Amino acid sequence: MLTQTEMFEHIRRICRVTSVPIFADADTGYGGVLEAQRTIELWEEAGASVLHIEDQAMPKKCGHFTGKQLIPAEEMRQKLRAMLDARSDPDFFVVARTDAMGVTDLDDAIARLESYAAVGVDGLYVDAPRSVEQLAEISRRLKPLGLPLLFNMVRSGKSPYLTLREAYDLGFDYAICPVEPMLAMHKAVKEMMETFMREGCSTNAIADRLTPFDEFNDFIGLREFVAREKQFGS
């Protein structure tokens, strides 16, 4: 449901507070070739270092949901060509993703990525393989292309949940873990609020699981702001 502009703002805010390279989802590129070009321009401007773009038809769905539809492979190649042409930083990494596993089959997924590789992308990504055997087959057939392969570590999704070492041993070069931070936050806040209401507006029962206030303030950089206020304030 997030728009291109909303994603740009999220990426920009994250990149402002870290020097760690940011891998930012670009969904479908938010439209046709012109929107795909605008997407990479915005992602670079925001400070991201990597994006992946997928071959789903709009409106897209989570890769581990049912009901997905694909655009023709040639249409995706056109988007990729346009995006690469608009890239200003040669070190910005563009990963081509296919969602064919949830729509057609493994052979189509591999054929699509082979054709996307020919356009000049920097990495390849099959989303939602169903088994370790399929992951091994993806690696075996795509490794000869010489491009890094991405593995999506999603707990309770369509794919088997592997450790990074297990994925690496299968031939994958790097991984994303996009869902677990949200799941952890949801569980922590849910349990805190349930305890708060059950214990009469108190969190004493879970105090050992709460970050101390001073530690949190240090984490968000409050000391720096206080020092700057003292330096420049009246």
Regions found by a protein language model. Give the residues of each.
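Extended, intrinsically disordered, low-complexity segments
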Residues: 182, 186-234
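Alpha/beta enzyme core
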Residues: 1-153, 157-173, 177, 183, ...
